[in-house]
Amino acid sequence: MNAPHKTGTGRRAIPAAVDIDALIRAEHRDPFSILGPHGDGGSGQYVRAYLPAALSVRLLAKDDGRELGEMEMSEVPGFFVGHLEQPQPYLLKVQWAGGEQITEDPYSFGPLLGEMDLYLFAEGNHRDLSSCLGAQVTKVDGVDGVRFAVWAPNARRVSVVGSFNSWDGRRHPMRLRHPTGVWEIFVPRLQPGEVYKYEILGAHGILPLKSDPMALATTLPPDTASKVSAPLQFEWNDQEWLRSRTGRHDVAAPLSIYELHAGSWQMEQHEDGQWRQYNWRELADRLIPYVKELGFTHIELMPIMEHPFGGSWGYQLLAQFAPTARYGSPEDFAAFVDACHRAEIGVILDWVPAHFPTDTHGLAQFDGTALYEYADPKEGFHQDWNTLIYNLGRTEVHGFMLASALHWLKHYHIDGLRVDAVASMLYRDYSRNAGEWVPNRFGGRENIETIDFLRHLNDVVALEAPGTMVIAEESTAWPGVSEPTQQGGLGFNYKWNMGWMHDSLQYMMRDPLHRRHHHSTLTFGLVYAWSERFVLPISHDEVVHGKHSLIDKMPGDRWQKFANLRAYLSFMWTHPGKKLLFMGCEFGQWREWNHDEQLDWYLMQYADHVGVKNLVGDLNRLYRQEKALHQRDADPAGFQWLIGDDQANSVFAYLRWSNDGEPLLVVANMTPVPRLAYRVGAPVSGAWTELLNSDAETYAGSNMGNGGEVNTEDEPAHGMEASLKLNLPPLAVLILKPKKD
């Protein structure tokens, strides 16, 4: 080991002043060209390190730790240079004011990411990006540490900063990999749990510290740092569920979804009156038995990806790959999903590829330019939510969102994604006036980049995560949302039926006296019920912002409100389409949903609230047991009107048919007037069993009905040779089935 010197070749131990100056000012675009080991022009090598605030640096032999000599500090404080007679692996022994550190030199490692990884990323088709970019706990050349990689093609310099380097951007400037614009560095000996951000020098100067778009874990909000997370280490026990879920998600299978917000479903109250949210494991212990008791097949979680503002309910998120720290660690979330699967409950996540918030630590102007968003506000700013719109026409952003979807489906065994705000993605003029939007390349209003992305997403998910579902929240009449991409559709498995939801709620909110004038509002949904594969959604959006809770939408006095609610839920469960119900609706919570408070569980001491809960449980069990209620959802022949035109009495009657030709008869009386001896045609003669009566005493109804069984009469009605004479309870639905011998 010698002091720095000039070799006979003229190579300088100290780099050019312009390079040193750029390094000191943290503006050097290629720190690896200066720092680390470099040949001296002969048989030896120089070792350079820039360690601001270091008191001294010594070189140690990598193999046995023997001291090779002290590096000399140059005229520039913190810039150290040493010389080795022969190239050899070495360690840096750094003396700081607060202690000593021994580590490998981050600038002694060559390029990290493989060319194929970079190619697939640039192409927008990397299927496992969450194991490539971001902070990856890994081993390089036998050394444990963390590899950081971030996409910032227009940055002049990117550094990773954290408590491990005193948040000093001069300590770990990264290597730029041309031409993809990915910056990378390996920090030896760094451990999981370290917090970090990226310090980025843009074209116009230093930007606010940025969180990692590819972070696998984060700190607890309101903190905004990313957290180094080891690859998910969880022993899954859900293999039986995974093998069976393809059949469970088939259009002919029962699909009944309980939508919830993880933080406000149920909480623990401390003695001081403060509320504490449950973590994932605690929530599993309480939620799973409840969902199992009610008979739902799946739960749907409002977005659980990390989001800075809790009041956004998760829909304004910034970490597309990290579960929020509010409810525990990534392993805790995996344990929650695994517990659901072992209880035969599927897990669907709300997923938001449409837009993201403008927080300065997030994706906005990430490298000093509109990187993830459109540059033109007419394309890139969402006026309804004051958010930015993903530029899915950019291949890297396309691939980023595609990888996010696959990350949840594959790494966390998620069973389906509900894609939020699809309508806002499909139309360039969504919620915009004339002159406020940019036409596509053909002059139209369709967002061609989004259409391409959604089709690619659904094709890739079907290939990479078979048996999972992708469900669209799409509120317009866009054709073919759930049609295969090969047939020109978008390729979703299901689409939310927003039209049915709006029409049916409008009907139910009317005074029963006036329903006769709006009879077709309730029947209209059957005109287009088979145009898509539909989910009937009563979601969180319908019980907030002054819309009233589901039961409080219903007209009448207290008894009538409950009767209307029971009738509505029974109508929903017997209507073609899969089911989704938001938490609290299943027992008739009076309050609108508030994300800061738990549901009003105290209401379960009242019989009428318990009655609604009992009804939902029985509807789910009937829905799963009776093939006629789910098997032919996508087949118009599985539904048959008997009475759709009795406006005067506001009575509806229809049949649901199974593949085996077994019928169920549904009769609904949507007025508070009992209809005695009301005749309904029957396709099968003999005794019919009353499977469910929403007015039954067990549901806190008046208990009017038909004694559990009724026989047909040989009097033709409604195109049938036989008929049933039924007593129709007030504001109630009956479900009947032919009695088997």
Curated annotation (Swiss-Prot):
Pathway: Glycan biosynthesis; glycogen biosynthesis. Its EC number is 2.4.1.18. Gene3D superfamilies: Glycosidases, Golgi alpha-mannosidase II, Immunoglobulins. One of its GO terms (cellular component) is cytosol. Belongs to the glycosyl hydrolase 13 family. GlgB subfamily. CDD domains: AmyAc_Glg_BE, E_set_GBE_prok_N. NCBIfam families: branching_enzym (TIGR01515), PRK05402.1 (NF003811), PRK12313.1 (NF008967). It catalyses: Transfers a segment of a (1->4)-alpha-D-glucan chain to a primary hydroxy group in a similar glucan chain. The active site is at D420, E473. Keywords: Carbohydrate metabolism, Glycogen biosynthesis, Glycogen metabolism, Glycosyltransferase, Transferase. The gene is glgB. The keyword Repressor does not apply. Catalyzes the formation of the alpha-1,6-glucosidic linkages in glycogen by scission of a 1,4-alpha-linked oligosaccharide from growing alpha-1,4-glucan chains and the subsequent attachment of the oligosaccharide to the alpha-1,6 position. One of its GO terms (biological process) is glycogen biosynthetic process. One of its GO terms (molecular function) is 1,4-alpha-glucan branching enzyme activity. This is 1,4-alpha-glucan branching enzyme GlgB. It is an enzyme of class 2 (transferase). SMART domains: Aamy. Monomer.
